[in-house]
A protein has these predicted regions:
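Helix-boundary capping/turn motifs
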Residues: 81, 226-228, 257-261
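Short coil/turn segments at secondary-structure boundaries
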Residues: 120-125, 178-182, 231, 237-242, ...
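Conserved Class I SAM-dependent methyltransferase catalytic core
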Residues: 239-289
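Conserved proline-anchored active-site loop of SAM-dependent methyltransferases
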Residues: 109-114, 218-236
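Active-site-proximal loop/turn and secondary-structure-junction residues that shape catalytic pockets
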Residues: 171, 232, 272-274
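Short interface patches used for recognition in eukaryotic signaling and trafficking proteins
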Residues: 72-77, 105-107, 235-242, 265-272
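Intrinsically disordered, low-complexity glycine/charged-rich regulatory or linker segments
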Residues: 1-218
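Beta-strand-rich binding-surface signature
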Residues: 86, 105-108, 162-164, 220-227, ...
Length: 289
């Protein structure tokens, strides 16, 4: 599930002309011996959870293979499209008109993004914007192709193709990550517009806030669009995926709040949102957008 959070307004702070450059947030989630319990008032279903618990009795490798094969959409991706994330992103940016107020001076940040489905989507979208096939200033608002996908809908063409994309993901070349089966950035997304960074400590870890500060320093300007598509293999602990991702999601929210320009857009991937902590994380976003 993705949260599409529009229009950064900095509601956390009362002074309209306040300088935000020196603001630091204390990012921390208390750790408990047992995972936080989901609650019915947030949509938790005991019957569904009983069925999910049965997965624990299945060999994890077999379960992953079966899960892939029973999902009819897992094998729909065809070259040169990198993965299904591209299609998710493509639908989001068109349905919510994310680039409606984008200008040539704006910059984009894609976090936790390898192999680069979202980056590929941004590349293709902005390059289409620059194509001068139709001399008319107006382009049709919306079209659907033969496969049912929304085509680019835009009201304007941009004047040049000097857009800039920044991205950060875990550095798979480091010894501590070599057993994680991390993806590499796909060659189809590498171009002059893309700046790949692994942060101050060269790990690409979003949980190290120094790496977020490093992005702020190299970009020099706040970001029009920030996406956070982070996630990791929960192993055999399927039912606690939500709880296991608390720290990562909080760090991504911190990055969004700290690095976003006013009136910018933030796309955040979350999993289940059935616990008090998840609700608080979402509430934090409502204070700022």
């Amino acid at each position: 599930m993705y949260l599409i959070i529009n229009k950064m307004i900095y509601k956390l702070f009362s002074e309209e002309n306040m300088d935000y450059s020196d603001i630091k947030l204390n990012v921390n989630i208390n750790k408990f011996n047992e995972p936080e319990l989901p609650q019915e008032k947030y949509g938790y279903d005991f019957k569904l959870n009983d069925y999910r618990n049965k997965i624990d009795n299945i060999n994890s490798d077999n379960w992953k293979k079966v899960r892939w094969y029973i999902n009819e959409y897992d094998f729909q991706v065809k070259d040169p499209i990198i993965n299904r994330a591209f299609y998710k992103y493509w639908e989001i940016i068109n349905e919510f008109e994310i680039y409606e107020e984008y200008t040539e001076k704006d910059v984009i940040l894609h976090c936790a993004e390898a192999p680069g489905g979202f980056i590929q989507g941004t590349n293709i979208y902005l390059q289409i914007e620059y194509l001068n096939i139709n001399k008319d200033k107006q382009i049709k608002k919306i079209e659907i192709d033969n496969s049912g996908f929304i085509m680019v809908k835009s009201k304007k063409k941009l004047n040049n193709n000097n857009y800039k994309i920044y991205t950060i993901s875990l550095n798979k070349e480091l010894p501590q990550y070599r057993n994680y089966n991390l993806p590499s950035y796909n060659k189809n997304i590498i171009n002059k517009h893309l700046c790949i960074t692994y942060g101050k400590d060269k790990t690409g870890d979003m949980n190290n806030l120094d790496n977020i500060e490093y992005i702020n320093n190299i970009s020099k300007v706040p970001f029009y669009l920030i996406t956070a598509d982070g996630g990791f293999d929960e192993g055999t602990d399927f039912n606690n995926k939500e709880q296991l991702h608390y720290n990562l999601i909080l760090s991504e929210i911190y990055a969004g709040i700290y690095l976003q320009k006013q009136n910018g857009h933030f796309i955040l991937k979350v999993f289940d949102t059935l616990t008090e902590t998840s609700v608080h994380l979402i509430y934090l976003l409502t204070l700022c957008y």
